[in-house]
């Protein structure tokens, strides 16, 4: 069992203290992806916590890739589901970035199709 030191003071009411604050699910994500997941300045984080009934803590890692470590606390099945949800959202972000043509490519092929009629 992994015991971590929870630094958050605003523990959500659905998290049972102390039993839900041990053995967190942990994964790493780039800070840019984290902004996609939680919004600017983490504006959507509390909503995602409430919907998933989990609690998240973020820890900056000193790395050139600007990685953030995400700790997920809560009941075991809730932690696993919340981790899966966040990792799925991160994967979707990466897939969208790969499919999205760069602006350079966009303008190399003539920019927007001006022959389309407005509806």
Swiss-Prot record:
GO molecular function, a single term: RNA binding
GO cellular component entries: cytoplasm
Superkingdom to which the source organism belongs: Eukaryota
Subcellular location: Cytoplasm
Gene3D superfamilies to which the protein is assigned, alphabetical: K Homology domain, type 1
Predominant place of localization: cytoplasm
InterPro entries according to UniProt: KH_dom_type_1_sf, MOEP19_KH-like
Keywords carried by this UniProt record: Cytoplasm, Developmental protein, RNA-binding
Annotated ranges, domain KH: 24-86
Sequence similarity: Belongs to the KHDC1 family.
General function of this protein: Involved in the maintenance of embryonic stem (ES) cell pluripotency. Dispensable for self-renewal of pluripotent ES cells and establishment of germ cells. Associates with specific target mRNAs.
Protein name, as recorded: Developmental pluripotency-associated protein 5B/5C
Organism: Mus musculus (Mouse)
